[in-house]
């Protein structure tokens, strides 16, 4: 019995070490960071029309009414903490719509933000050079890739889930998963 208990404990510790989850960064903590580093907020788009029975706001490749409402609500929370930022999006209807509903600002569309391999990091650095705070709307597989590649985190983002990164001395640092309501 003692052997099996020890084996179970070792197995549990091994699995918890292997399956790392992202650190949590509270949105409320962002304004407290009075440094000169650029911040990058990377969000997944809102609820997709083509994978939902909810009412669409436009074509099937866009977001639903629920997705638009979530983007507006999250944008209001975000704007209360971080009001000065530039908005970027991949070139899909759903990311562009989410970015517009979230921010109410003009959205810069960069197709290269859809390329979710090692080149994404140079793209992120280039975008961050231009702004103190950058908000990017992309896709779940891009966010999962970034989390896995940078920190070996297992992260399957839901709609409008996001990561926070800092660009410090030319390097990208993945701070964690952004907790909007905290």
Stretch-by-stretch model annotation:
Residues 5, 10-112, 116-119, 143-144, ...:
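Active-site-proximal alpha-helix that buttresses catalytic centers in soluble enzyme cores
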Residues 38-40, 130-138:
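Generic beta-sheet signal
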Residues 80-82, 128-132:
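Glycine-rich phosphate-binding loop signature in dinucleotide/nucleotide-binding domains
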Residues 121-127:
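Short, surface-exposed amphipathic charged segments that create phosphate/polyanion-binding patches used
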């Amino acid at each position: 019995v003692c052997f099996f208990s020890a084996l179970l404990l070792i197995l549990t510790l091994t699995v918890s070490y292997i399956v790392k989850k992202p650190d949590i960064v509270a949105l409320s903590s962002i304004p407290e960071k009075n440094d000169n580093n650029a911040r990058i907020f990377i969000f997944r788009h809102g609820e997709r029309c083509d994978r939902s029975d909810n009412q669409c706001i436009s074509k099937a490749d866009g977001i639903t009414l629920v997705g638009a409402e979530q983007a507006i609500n999250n944008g209001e929370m975000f704007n209360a903490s971080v009001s000065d930022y530039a908005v970027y999006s991949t070139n899909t209807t759903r990311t562009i719509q989410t970015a517009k509903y979230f921010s109410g600002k003009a959205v810069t569309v960069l197709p290269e933000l859809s390329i979710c391999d090692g080149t994404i990091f140079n793209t992120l650095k280039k975008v961050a050079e231009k702004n103190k705070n950058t908000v990017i709307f992309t896709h779940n597989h891009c966010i999962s890739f970034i989390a896995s590649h940078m920190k070996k985190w297992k992260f399957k983002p839901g709609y409008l889930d996001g990561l926070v990164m800092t660009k410090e001395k030319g390097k990208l640092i993945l701070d964690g998963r952004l907790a909007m309501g905290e």
